[in-house]
From Swiss-Prot:
Coiled coil: none annotated. It holds the Pfam family MMR_HSR1. The keyword GTP-binding applies. GO terms for biological process: tRNA methylation; tRNA wobble uridine modification. It comes from the Bacteria. GTP binds at residues 224-229, 243-249, 268-271. It comes from Pelagibacter ubique (strain HTCC1062). Keywords: Cytoplasm, GTP-binding, Hydrolase, Magnesium, Metal-binding, Nucleotide-binding, Potassium, tRNA processing. This is tRNA modification GTPase MnmE. The gene is mnmE.
Length: 443
């Protein structure tokens, strides 16, 4: 089938781009323009007509990319037209009337590029990450992965395992032949090197995933401490309802922020207190779960009635900031215990010391987001395959004696397969759907 879709964002725009890919792309161009194919990769102005008529849809630029030298590896074209809904719909309708043409699924153009060997799986994922990047650090990470450094590293490790696997399988195929001592030593040396490399890659504090998904901040504290007001201030908009009535927030309210280029997901949670209301109790449990899974906790308490004990005190650690709100109403010094914790006195209502709090948050972000060229993991599936590969290699080393070569070879094959799954070197059909469904239609 030949596929087509709008590749630019929906809505009114000066220019819209409709992509077409497949063996009937030539026919689509000829039928819509009533003219010969444009020169390869040369922007050509053409009148675009409704199918089988001379009624003009629009006048626009056509680009023709013969396969395999195209994004998808197939014959491909782009129609650059005026970006009104009526023009786009008319062009889509005309293409749909051509035999063997259908609307593309989400991410199908990039899926074709992967299947036709134009890109590896890591690059496909990095394209999706670049499209959805909201902050500078997310853009930088997506570009780094797109440039192939991660793929090169994983491919290099896989090739090392393939090399020693060939020696192990040679021993299995020719059991009467003894492997030279230097080859046996080399097998152990290389497998140990790969193990150390994988351990180093995994020891990254999950920075890559944090950058991609966002640094998680949970605002937690007793009722009416000003948690929702703080969320609204950080967001510069009214995200949460603010009320004098205690227990207004029952569910978790999340908002995505960009703080100095760092992606952040801030969660406002239900107030912590003893409650007999079943719905409120569930909200409090959600709040504590968010706190447990957060990268940073903002523990907000009311300066008028400082109640810092029990659960809230237990939550204080190196990943927490004690935020004492309504500090303009504080009529006594803080006790020495509270002063020992990292804290800040603020008043959301009077805009007091909020910049100090934001500065502390930024410092926490910078410490969490210490990036380096060694960050290679950006998704949970990368980490899972590396961990599984590592476990297989450990099993391999335990069996790395001549009499166990049959079993050892299987461990080595599995370790190699898991590394291949990361870049798509082996059959990965079962994960393609989850990856490419995250794309927009037209990409």
């Amino acid at each position: 089938m030949t596929i087509y879709a709008l590749s630019t964002g929906p809505g009114i725009s000066g220019i819209a781009i409709v992509r077409v890919s497949g063996k009937d792309t030539k026919k689509v161009i000829k039928l819509l323009t009533n003219a010969a194919l444009p020169e390869t990769r040369v922007a050509t102005l053409r009148k675009i007509n409704k199918i089988n008529t001379s009624e003009l849809i629009d006048e626009g630029i056509i680009l023709w990319f013969p396969g395999p030298e195209s994004y998808t590896g197939e014959d491909m074209a782009e129609f650059h037209i005026h970006g009104s809904k009526a023009v786009i719909d008319a062009l889509h309708h005309s293409i749909s009337k051509i035999k063997n043409c259908r609307l593309a699924d989400p991410g199908e153009f990039t899926k074709l590029a992967f299947q036709n060997g134009k890109i590896n799986l890591l690059k496909a994922e990095s394209i999706a990450d670049l499209i959805s990047a909201e902050t500078e650090i997310q853009r930088q990470q997506a570009i780094k992965i797109m440039n192939g450094k991660s793929a090169d590293k994983f491919n290099n490790l896989r090739e090392k395992l393939l090399k020693i696997l060939s020696h192990v399988e040679a021993k299995i195929d020719f059991p009467d032949e003894d492997l030279p001592e230097d080859i046996l030593k080399n097998i152990k040396k290389i497998s140990n090197e790969v193990i150390l490399n994988i351990k180093k890659i995994l020891d990254d504090q999950k920075v890559g995933e944090r950058i991609r998904e966002g640094f998680k901040i949970a605002i937690i504290g007793p009722t009416n401490a000003g948690k929702s007001s703080l969320l609204n201030h950080l967001s510069n908009r009214d995200v949460a309802i603010v009320s004098e009535i205690a227990g207004t927030t029952r569910d978790v309210i999340e908002t995505h922020l960009n703080i100095d280029g760092y992606p952040v997901v801030v969660s406002d949670t239900a107030g912590i207190r003893d409650s007999k209301n079943e719905i409120e109790k569930k909200g409090i449990k959600l709040a504590l779960d968010k706190a447990d899974n957060a990268d940073l906790k903002l523990i907000v308490i009311d300066a008028k009635s400082i109640d810092f004990k029990g659960v809230l005190k237990e939550l204080m650690d190196e990943n927490a900031i004690l935020v004492i709100n309504k500090s303009d109403l504080l009529n006594k010094d803080l006790n020495s215990e509270i002063k020992n914790y990292e804290h800040v006195l603020i008043s959301v209502k009077n805009n007091l010391n909020l910049e100090d709090l934001i500065s502390k948050i930024k410092n926490k972000l910078k410490n969490k987001f210490i990036t380096s060229e060694d960050i290679l993991i950006t998704r949970a599936r990368h980490r899972q395959h590396l961990e599984q590969s590592l476990n297989c290699l450990k099993n391999f080393e335990e069996k790395n004696e001549a009499e166990d070569f049959d079993k050892a070879a299987e461990d080595l094959r599995l370790a190699t397969r898991h590394l291949g799954m990361i870049v798509g070197k082996v059959d990965v059909e079962e994960i393609l759907g989850s990856i490419f469904n995250d794309f927009c239609i037209g990409k």
